[in-house]
């Protein structure tokens, strides 16, 4: 018989901390029921109000959910540091790791020459009264966004795409509000939504992005914000097509109460045209990161949007982090202005496309339908994730289980192709075919 985790504490803070410890250590797993308020109060010799306050704080932080007569349970994706990592099985010794979702370091532009040039040119250290955004960076960013059809009168910078999205959600929403997110979608975003105490509503995805019907359903369920990946959607590789963009803009036009967030994290690597939704709603933001083209360690994203939204994000940053390092801003500006770097990024995008298409073709030759219009990943629907991931691990290949990315979507696995060598394509496809049975064509979601 399983031993029940013993919650302890004599105050609401201590009780909530004890529950969080149980979740973090795995003693309280996803879906585990917490004791009824009065039962736990009697057990701990505290008032029911003290336990109720502890549970309220856990709900606010996205660790637990309350479902009427079903009581209070641990959330399926509680936002604690070890939870998401626990969903990803460790690579077997000597296994080829295709689970991480990172660009190929061999294809990233060299930063050394740009850093050396900055060291020679940079002036005195910037003081606390400096502007948050370098004017020259804002000027180049506006031109680059305008070339893609994104209005960019207002510009600020954040510490990466997720930082920008977090600030946007905090500026417009309150705990308990609903956010429409792609399903399957970016694991970090799903965890962020939970950590903020927001309620995710999954929107089905097909190769052209979030479906119109799915967005309409999410709006009917009360979504206050919608997050859309413009291109290279993680994990499916979807990209918003022109017809889908038109249909979504028409749908969103009558929603003055909705915050629209677009994430164009792939930027120049995407190799398909951008069809933005920017401006479809009064409150909107478009976020473009530099991490995929230039390297994950460059934590900078450009954020544009309506005047009020950008002002909220910039104002909150001023009383928090202050600003994104101007050294980093100057480095990004130098990379943007360098034609040689642009050529390297363009060739990297072409190479990712070639590797992705090679794996998709090899899977198709074995009766398997994978997906990946853009980006560095291939999404493969499977009947059973655990069986597929385990079989591939035993065969020497590590892939990411779809549970990292799903709310209600059908099972699948994500295979990162960014570092996939030509000689590995056929052996990998053979291993995948042996691990899963063929699945028919269709979308990614239930």
Could you say what each language-model-derived stretch is?
Residues 1-119, 126, 139, 318-324, ...:
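N-terminal basic, amphipathic alpha-helical segments
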Residues 181, 262-263:
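Hydrophobic residues in beta-strands of the RecA-like P-loop NTPase core, especially within AAA+ ATPase
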Residues 178, 199, 259, 369, ...:
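Residue-level detector of anion-binding/catalytic polar loops
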Residues 349-360, 368-381:
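Conserved glycine-rich beta-strand-loop-beta hairpin in the small C-terminal domain of fold type I
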Residues 304, 379-381, 416-418:
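Short hydrophobic/aromatic beta-strand micro-patches
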Residues 125-256, 268-282, 444:
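Conserved core of the PLP fold type I
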Residues 286-349:
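Conserved core segment of the aminotransferase class I/II
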């Amino acid at each position: 018989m399983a031993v029940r985790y013993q919650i302890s504490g004599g105050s609401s803070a201590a009780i909530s901390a004890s529950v969080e410890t149980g979740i973090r250590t795995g003693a309280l797993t996803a879906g585990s029921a917490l004791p009824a308020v009065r039962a736990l109060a009697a057990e701990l010799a505290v008032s029911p109000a003290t336990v109720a306050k502890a549970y309220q704080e856990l709900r606010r932080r996205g660790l637990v959910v309350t479902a009427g007569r079903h009581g209070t349970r641990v959330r399926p994706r509680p936002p604690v540091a070890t939870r998401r990592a626990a969903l990803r099985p460790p690579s077997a010794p000597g296994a080829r790791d295709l689970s991480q979702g990172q660009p190929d370091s061999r294809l990233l532009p060299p930063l050394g020459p740009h850093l050396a040039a900055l060291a020679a040119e940079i002036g005195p250290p910037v003081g606390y009264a400096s502007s948050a955004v370098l004017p020259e960076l804002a000027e180049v960013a506006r031109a680059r966004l305008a070339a893609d059809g994104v209005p960019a009168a207002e510009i600020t910078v954040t510490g990466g795409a997720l930082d920008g999205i977090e600030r946007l959600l905090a500026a417009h929403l309150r705990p308990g509000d609903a956010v429409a997110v792609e399903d399957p979608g970016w694991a970090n975003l799903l965890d962020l939504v939970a950590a903020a105490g927001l309620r995710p509503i999954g929107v089905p995805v097909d190769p052209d992005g979030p479906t119109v019907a799915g967005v309409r359903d999410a709006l009917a369920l009360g979504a206050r914000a919608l997050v859309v990946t413009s291109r290279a959607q993680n994990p499916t590789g979807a990209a918003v097509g022109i017809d889908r963009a038109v249909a979504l803009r028409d749908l969103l036009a009558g929603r003055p109460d909705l915050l629209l967030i677009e994430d164009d994290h792939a930027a120049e690597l995407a190799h398909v045209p951008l069809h933005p939704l920017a401006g479809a709603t009064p409150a909107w933001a478009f976020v473009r990161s530099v991490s995929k083209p230039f390297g994950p360690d460059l934590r900078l994203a450009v954020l544009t949007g309506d005047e009020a939204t950008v002002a909220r994000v910039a104002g909150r940053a001023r009383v928090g982090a202050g600003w994104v390092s101007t050294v980093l801003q100057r480095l990004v500006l130098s990379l943007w202005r360098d034609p040689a770097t642009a050529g390297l990024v363009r060739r990297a995008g072409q190479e990712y496309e070639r590797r992705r298409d090679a794996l998709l073709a090899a899977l198709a030759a074995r009766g398997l339908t994978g997906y990946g219009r853009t980006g560095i990943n291939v999404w493969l629907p499977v009947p059973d994730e655990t069986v597929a991931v385990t079989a591939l691990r035993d065969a020497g290949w590590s892939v990411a289980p779809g549970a990292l990315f799903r709310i209600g979507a059908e099972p699948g696995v994500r295979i990162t192709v960014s570092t996939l060598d030509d000689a590995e394509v056929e052996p990998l496809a053979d291993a995948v075919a042996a691990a899963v049975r063929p699945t028919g064509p269709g979308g990614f979601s239930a």
